[in-house]
Swiss-Prot record:
Gene: BIO2
The protein, known as: Biotin synthase, mitochondrial
Lineage: Eukaryota, Fungi, Dikarya, Ascomycota, Saccharomycotina
Root EC class: transferase
Domain Radical SAM core: 81-310
Classification via InterPro entries: Aldolase_TIM, BATS_dom, Biotin_synth/BioAB, Biotin_synthase, Elp3/MiaA/NifB-like_rSAM, rSAM
Length: 375
């Protein structure tokens, strides 16, 4: 089978964009191609990413024998990315706690008894200080997170965040913020400030979503992503693995992302850190609950890399729970970004020195800011 993959890689088929412009005809042609080749070989043969994946195609790829799947993902990664580069991101919590949402996993929800108190938003000078430290340590994207449901009625906060974004950009760092739901006007304000990317995760599959969150719909999340992309900001959207979901939910999660047009610029993969006092931690304490296996993480990453080849795939929260060998295999499966520094909002994060040593051992170097456009 691998010889077939190599053969199709060397004789890549015409890009989908060269087919008929009618969307229905494109979809039919793509389905025919995939049927002839098999989903994995079809994905590897494309000159441009497809945005019309079916769940059956994704399931076929996801359940490819693991060694073959990982190898295919590495082939795809090397086809679309510089395999020696890794994007280093640092995240700062600029407004902690007090969120009105009921996300079962989150320490910052006011509905969860985690002992985390709501705090006011930090000052601009504090952000600049943290961004300078991140830059000294090699990070090229600086991310700001605030525990809010949305930005309604937060005009003064928006002005301060715009100032933060502009000043961090002036330091030569890319900027990303996660502020909850934003409308088109708010997205435009962030774009005008120079924002590089906006993070808004879909968390899981549409089918599993309501078992985790009820105060914000799946379509609410998709609308925010649409608002962001239409404003000209890159979308950073991924999810959390380990929420009691099934492997079909991993496939459904990838299905949503891979059918976006354009695909997310970056795709963070979080491994759940079960926090005491959250409903999710209580559910997972049940011996009968569904526990996430490492091979499921690997399959999710590899499948995402194969069907969203241009995206930056980022190991995010929970990476500190992985052994170095596990992280290494994730990079072999297509990861090319990490969060590094002091903290991931309310959970631990691998430190800069630790990560520098690990990446140097692997022969990886930081991506330069503003010079890695895969759109």
């Amino acid at each position: 089978m691998m010889s077939t993959i190599y053969r199709h890689l060397s004789t890549a088929r015409p890009a989908l964009t060269k087919y008929a412009t009618n969307a229905a005809v494109k979809s039919t042609t793509a389905s025919s191609e995939a049927s002839t080749l098999g989903a994995l070989q079809y994905a590897l043969s494309l000159d441009e990413p497809s945005h019309s994946w079916t769940k059956s195609q994704l399931k076929e790829i996801y359940h490819t024998p693991l060694l073959e799947l990982t190898h295919a993902a590495q082939l795809q990664h090397r086809k679309w990315h510089d395999p020696t580069k890794v994007q280093l991101c640092t995240l700062m919590n600029i407004k902690s706690g007090g969120c009105s949402e009921d996300c079962k996993y989150c320490a910052q929800s006011s509905r969860n008894d985690t002992g985390l108190k709501a705090e006011k938003m930090v000052k601009v000078d504090e952000v600049i200080k943290e961004a300078e430290e991140a830059k000294r340590n090699g990070s090229t994207r600086f991310c700001l997170g605030a525990a809010w449901r949305d930005m309604k009625g937060r005009k003064s906060a928006m002005k301060r965040i715009q100032e933060m974004v502009t000043k961090v950009n002036d330091m030569g760092l890319e900027t990303c913020v996660t502020l909850g739901m934003v409308d088109q006007d708010q997205a435009k304000q962030l774009k005008d400030a120079g924002l590089t990317a906006y993070n808004h995760n879909i968390d899981t599959s549409r089918e599993h979503y309501s078992k985790v969150i009820t105060t914000r719909t799946y379509d609410d999340r998709l609308q925010t992503i649409k608002n962001v992309q239409e404003s000209g900001i890159k979308a950073c959207t991924g999810g959390i693995l380990g929420l009691g979901e099934s492997e079909d939910d991993h496939i459904g999660f990838i299905y949503t992302l891979s059918n976006m047009s354009p695909h997310p610029e970056s795709l963070p993969i979080n491994r759940l850190v079960a926090i005491k006092g959250t409903p999710m931690a209580e559910e997972l304490a049940d011996p009968k609950s569904k526990k996430l296996q490492f091979d499921e993480i690997l399959r999710t990453i590899a499948t995402a890399r194969i069907v969203m080849p241009k995206a930056i795939i980022r190991l995010a929260a929970g990476r500190y729970t992985m052994k170095e060998t596990e992280q290494f295999v994730c990079f072999m499966a297509g990861c090319n970004s990490i969060f590094t520094g002091k903290k991931m909002l309310t959970t631990m994060c691998n430190g800069w020195d630790e990560d520098k040593a690990m990446l140097a051992k692997w022969g990886l170097q930081p991506m330069e800011a503003f010079k890695y456009d895969r759109s």
